[in-house]
């Protein structure tokens, strides 16, 4: 769990760095334009530079979306763990209600669903082709 939290923090730090790099690149482009006012070379260099940073920022944006969905799933998983902990600590109180078995069955179904989601995320982050697709698109 700590590794996934570290991963999400790393992604958001990289997003912040990419924003700083984009701001720096725009300043650099403006200075190149000011220096070579009507040169074709300056505009070509600026366009290539901006295109590469646009791809870079799009890749980080997609990665941030994946981390956002992953974080939601982790929060659901943590809520299930807390719910199970509460059930075990107050098991006597829950046994008096008829809805206890139904609630326990729903918890098991949610646990199975989130286990499948977490294994999908593990496969996704382990797959190296995902990163190339993310950067190239």
Curated annotation (Swiss-Prot):
Protein name, UniProt field: Uncharacterized protein MG074
Superkingdom of the source species: Bacteria
Xref: InterPro entries: DUF5426 (IPR035339)
């Amino acid at each position: 769990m700590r590794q996934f939290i570290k991963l999400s923090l790393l992604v958001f730090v990289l997003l912040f760095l990419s924003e700083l790099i984009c701001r720096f690149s725009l300043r650099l482009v403006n200075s190149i334009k000011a220096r070579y006012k009507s040169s074709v070379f300056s505009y070509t260099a600026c366009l290539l530079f901006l295109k590469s940073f646009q791809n870079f920022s799009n890749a980080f944006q997609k990665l941030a979306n994946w981390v956002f969905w992953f974080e939601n799933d982790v929060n659901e998983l943590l809520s299930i763990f807390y719910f199970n902990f509460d059930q075990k600590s107050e098991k006597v109180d829950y046994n008096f209600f008829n809805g206890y078995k139904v609630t326990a069955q729903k918890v098991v179904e949610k646990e199975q669903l989130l286990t499948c989601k977490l294994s999908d995320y593990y496969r996704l982050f382990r797959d190296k082709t995902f990163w190339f697709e993310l950067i190239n698109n």
